[in-house]
């Protein structure tokens, strides 16, 4: 029995294609998926209800109360005690509130404000800077802004489809994508991190 020699190896390897330029792809354009506003008072009672009134004036929506997960004696909070209030805003209202918040910050954010997953957040000291009239019975509260960015086609990736041929792989956002979007949309300035 004679041995058959192995088939000749292909010397012509496929050349690697240059990476696609995705900047022209409309489905990769970013938009604000949601804006989360948070006021953490650290205690329940009258101050927390006044903070809820501030969020209701700002967004026009009913805010949600957050409870403490653990009892912390040094902070004076108990488990399941309401200590914060937050609200989620979407659509054109989210863009308008974000614009007012960035105007207070003079469109300047630090690199540390951006997360590795393409989201960013910042805080302001006084809610009256957003254009809400000062009410002595409410007082002054600071609040946090958290912005979740996503591509235009995000609704396609979150739906379960029955035929797997129609499945679209999700677009993974990076810190650089979010910073580039912020600079293009708002002509924002990104400062170096504090050291």
Curated annotation (Swiss-Prot):
Component of the ribosome, a large ribonucleoprotein complex responsible for the synthesis of proteins in the cell. The small ribosomal subunit (SSU) binds messenger RNAs (mRNAs) and translates the encoded message by selecting cognate aminoacyl-transfer RNA (tRNA) molecules. The large subunit (LSU) contains the ribosomal catalytic site termed the peptidyl transferase center (PTC), which catalyzes the formation of peptide bonds, thereby polymerizing the amino acids delivered by tRNAs into a polypeptide chain. InterPro entries: Ribosomal_uL5, Ribosomal_uL5_C, Ribosomal_uL5_CS, Ribosomal_uL5_dom_sf, Ribosomal_uL5_N. It is found in: Nucleus; Cytoplasm. The keyword Nucleus applies. It comes from Spodoptera frugiperda (Fall armyworm). GO terms for molecular function: rRNA binding; structural constituent of ribosome. Belongs to the universal ribosomal protein uL5 family. GO terms for biological process: translation. Component of the large ribosomal subunit. Pfam families: Ribosomal_L5, Ribosomal_L5_C. GO terms for cellular component: cytoplasm; nucleus; ribonucleoprotein complex; ribosome. Keywords: Cytoplasm, Nucleus, Ribonucleoprotein, Ribosomal protein, RNA-binding, rRNA-binding. The keyword rRNA-binding applies. Residues 1-25 are annotated as: Disordered. This is Large ribosomal subunit protein uL5.
């Amino acid at each position: 029995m004679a041995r058959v020699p192995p088939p000749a190896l292909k010397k012509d390897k496929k050349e690697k294609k240059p990476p696609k330029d995705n900047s022209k792809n409309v489905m990769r354009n970013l938009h604000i998926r949601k804006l989360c506003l948070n006021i953490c008072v650290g205690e329940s009672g009258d101050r927390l209800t006044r903070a809820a009134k501030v969020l209701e004036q700002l967004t026009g929506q009913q805010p949600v109360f957050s409870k403490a997960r653990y009892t912390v004696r040094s902070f004076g909070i108990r488990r399941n005690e309401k200590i914060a209030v937050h609200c989620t805003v979407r659509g054109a209202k989210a863009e308008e509130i974000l614009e007012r918040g960035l105007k207070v910050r003079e469109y300047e954010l630090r690199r540390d404000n951006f997360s590795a997953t393409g989201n960013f957040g910042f805080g302001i000291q006084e809610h009256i800077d957003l254009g809400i009239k000062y009410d002595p019975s409410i007082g002054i509260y600071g609040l946090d802004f958290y912005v979740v960015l996503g591509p235009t086609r995000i609704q396609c990736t979150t739906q379960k489809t029955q035929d797997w041929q129609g499945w679209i792989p999700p677009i993974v956002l990076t810190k650089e994508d979010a910073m580039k979007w912020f600079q293009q949309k708002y002509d924002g300035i990104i400062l170096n991190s504090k050291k």
